[in-house]
Every structure is written in C-alpha cells, then in structure tokens.
Regions:
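Intrinsically disordered, low-complexity linker/loop segments enriched in Gly/Pro
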Residues: 221-314
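Conserved mixed alpha/beta catalytic, RNA-binding, or beta-rich assembly cores of soluble enzyme
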Residues: 279-308, 312-389
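Central antiparallel beta-sheet cores of small beta-barrel/beta-sandwich binding domains
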Residues: 28-126
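Short, Lys/Arg- and Gly-enriched loop/turn segments at beta-strand edges
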Residues: 180-191, 219-229, 328-338, 427-430
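Short, structured beta-strand/loop micro-motifs enriched in basic residues and often containing a Trp
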Residues: 149-158, 190-197, 297-305
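N-terminal, Lys/Arg-enriched amphipathic/low-complexity engagement segments
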Residues: 140-189
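Bacterial N-terminal signal peptides
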Residues: 8-21
C-alpha cells in the first residue's frame, strides 16, 4: 500500500505539473500573439474608406508603445490605445475637427469605422467603414528596363483606366506616344484626337500622400513632320488683333529636319520662305490620375495632377514631380511637341508622335502641392488655374512651399529669396487653365543648406 500510494502521488504530481505547464504555455502563447499583433500595427498604412460608396484614400502612421498608439491620420496627430487586436484612437486637425477610429487588426489588415467630425458642424458627424493595409515596401533588386508598345490610348486621366504595365521604383520604361490628333509615327490614326495618352503605368509602392518622380531620359522625334495652325488663342488677342486674325485657324504642316535640328514650313508663304525654328522635343502631357472621388478630367485639361501642362521645358533630361492621389499613381504621358513657344499661343504646337523613355521613383509620405520640374540648372514650380493671375499665385505658393521644405526657410526668408531670384514664364494660355511657372536658378541656392531630398 505505501508503494502504491507513493506511485499515485508521483503520477498526480506529473499530470498536475503538465496541466499547469500547458496552461502556462497557452497563456504565454496568447501573450506572444498579442505582442506580435501589436508590433505589426506600427508602420505606414494606406486607408481605403468607403465614403458614401466612393473610395477615398488616406495615409496613416501608427506607433505602438506599451499599449498606447501615437502617429497621424492624414497628417492629423492621433493618440489612442491598442488592447489585443482592438484599436481606438482620435486624430485632431488644426481647426478642431476630429477623426475617431474604432477597429480591429486581423491577418495584417486593420478594419473598422472612422467617424469624421467637422469643427463647424459637430452635430452631424459622418461614420464610414474602412480597411487599411500596410504600405508596400520597395522591391529589392536590380531596376528593370521595360519595352512597352502601346495598343490602347486613353482620353481621360482616370483612376478607373486599367494599368497597361506595372513597374517598380527605379525601373525605366521605353515607349511611344501618338500625336494630339491620335496619329502614330507611321502616319496611321490609331485613336480619336484630343491628346490621347500612353499609359497608365502602375508604380509599385506609390500611394496617396506620396510624390511620383518621373525622369525623362529620352524624348526624341520618330517621324519627320508635325501639324500646327495659323491662329492665336483668345487669351492673346485684343480687339484689333482679333479682327486681323479672323481668317486664322487653318492647319499648317511642318517638316522636321533632325539632321540639322530645325523645323521648316512645308508650304511657306512668301515672307516665311526661309523661316526655321530649332527642334526641341517635349511632352505636353505628364500626369498622375486624380483620386477616384474626382471626375476624371479629359486629356486636354490640367491641374494639380499635372496633365496637359504644355510647358516647353518638359524635355529630355527634365525631372517632373507629381502628387500621388490613387494607389500606383497611374502615370500617363503624351502630346509630343517638336517645338513650342511659351504659352502654346497657336493652340497647337508642332504636334507630333514621340519616342519616349523615362525612369520612375517614389518619395514616400510627402506629396507636392502641384507639379514641379527640375532641370540641370533650375528648379521650377508650376501654377495652373483658370486665370493667369491665379496661376501666378499658385506658382508662387508652390515654390514658397518648396523652399520651406527643402531649405527650412522662414516666410520672410522665402520672400527675400523670391524677390531677388524669381523668373516667371507664362507656360500655357491655350486651354481652360492658364499656366505660369516660377523658376529659380540653382546657382542662387548654392549657399543654402538642403534639409530634404526635394
């Protein structure tokens, strides 16, 4: 009996110890899972909110420390908590409005509800369902070069158009564009006119709130003729000149002599028999897609997304910075010009097809307010609006923001730099929006200390 009793005690001890050990292990596993879940919350998230049936995208930065959340939602500072897989935070904007989030984390996705409260209408908050995924990481490896032959061309800068090619930051794309009338390098009309575009190109990791960088490494002619006209657009006419130009608007064909680098009229009038202009191939259109909530603008239009900017310094060697407002950026290029004077005064420049190569990159978490261009000698900020006055203001504000961001200048310092170094160009008068570009020679900025990449 004593031996049996001792054996029973021993067995009981072993079984009981195993149960305790198993329960303890399960508890530790649960704690580890919770810690793992919490750790996965820290980072940059892309929020897709269903706002009355329309997807709106936001960036959200979260940092978790000991159950507390910090960061920002769409740039608004947030504070909150995380308990297990449950998240709650409140973000506040400068006007006193709030975004309150209640959500759960599961399988790498945050989903729940965001309540938007406008400080001016606090009695009527709006609650919307959302999902969020961690922002994709840049692909590791050697950048790729893509040969893309377009078969479809689009006449809207739309987020709904299916991407024709997916590329990664650092990749290069070689392609072609048709002219503004839809005619290709062989003289074949491929699509209805109105600046049909090549693209859109989906750029991996580019998310709303980022900046897309497009470096034009090749902008070359691929045929020997271009079309223009003999009119002057209404913005360039006073009453007397309008009367004199009443018979204008006829199509004019130009010969493009790449061997000598000039364009000449194929059928010149008497006084223009020996007239020629230097060839300077450019792209009239470079654009990212506006957000899905916005009406898709036609490819003859322009705005903060870029578009039909018709700026004659968007040439080989230029770098264009554009805001990203939809996942993948959705980059469009087109509307090649063999040459163009400031403003595109005829309404049509020397319209032609083009051989184009570009390299893309992404600046994460930083979105430019409007199109910017950089050359070897200048930085250039664009303003595009319904009047030249408003475009002038937009260009000035765009450049002021650039100087503040890149060089940490104060507003008075910005004024001193602009007042002594600004160069203004009227870039566009032919379309709905006028364009004004503020340029600064980089030599004037050499003594300033750069604080950021752009």
């Amino acid at each position: 009996m004593p031996k049996v009793s001792s054996l029973f005690v021993l067995l009981f001890f072993l079984v009981f110890s195993g149960i305790v050990s198993a329960n303890g292990s399960q508890a530790l596993d649960a704690q580890d899972a919770a810690r793992t879940s919490n750790a996965s919350v820290s980072g940059r998230w892309i929020v897709n909110a269903d706002v009355f049936g329309t997807p709106l995208f936001y960036q959200m930065h979260l940092k978790e420390e000991a159950g507390k959340l910090m960061g920002d939602f769409a740039g608004d500072k947030l504070e909150g908590t995380i308990t297990g897989n449950s998240i709650h935070f409140v973000a506040k904007d400068e006007q006193g409005g709030t975004e309150e989030c209640t959500a759960t984390v599961k399988d790498g996705t945050v989903s729940g509800t965001i309540v938007f409260t406008d400080a001016g209408d606090a009695a009527h908050p709006n609650a919307h369902k959302f999902t969020a995924t961690i922002a994709p990481q840049r692909r590791v490896g050697v950048p790729q070069r893509h040969e893309f032959t377009p078969t479809t061309f689009y006449r809207q800068f739309s987020a709904a158009n299916k991407p024709v090619l997916t590329v990664s930051p650092g990749d290069t794309v070689h392609t072609t564009t048709v002219d503004a009338g839809g005619t290709d390098e062989k003289g074949l009309t491929r699509v209805l006119g109105g600046n049909p575009e090549t693209g859109p190109f989906y750029v991996e990791t580019a998310m709303p709130g980022d900046t897309l960088v497009v470096q034009l490494t090749r902008v070359r002619l691929n045929r020997d003729w271009a079309m223009s006209d003999d009119a002057i657009v209404p913005r360039g006419l006073d009453t007397d000149l309008a009367v004199k130009m009443k018979d204008g608007g006829k199509s004019v064909r130009w010969h493009l002599d790449t061997a000598h680098g000039v364009a000449t009229l194929e059928k010149p009038s008497e006084h223009l028999a020996h007239y020629s202009v230097p060839l300077r191939p450019m792209l009239g259109c470079v654009a990212t897609a506006p957000p899905p909530a916005a009406s898709a603008p036609g490819t003859g239009d322009s705005g903060g997304f870029g578009g039909n900017m018709d700026f004659n310094e968007v040439v080989e060697g230029a770098t264009i910075y554009l805001p990203v407002r939809t996942p993948g950026a959705l980059l469009y290029v087109g509307d090649g010009h063999a040459a163009q004077g400031d403003g595109e005064l005829n309404g049509n420049a020397l319209e032609t097809s083009m051989d184009v190569e570009f390299t893309v990159d992404v600046i994460p978490g930083k979105r430019v307010p409007g199109p910017r261009v950089e050359s070897a000698t200048h930085i250039m900020a664009m303003g595009l609006d319904g009047s030249i006055d408003d475009a002038f203001r937009n260009a000035t504000a765009n450049m002021a923001a650039w100087l503040e961001e890149k060089y940490a200048l104060t507003p008075p310092e910005v004024a001193e730099v602009l007042g002594t170094s600004a160069e203004y160009k009227v870039s566009e008068v032919a379309d709905r929006n006028a364009g004004v570009v503020l340029k600064i020679n980089k030599e004037h900025l050499q003594t300033l200390t750069s604080k950021s990449a752009m």
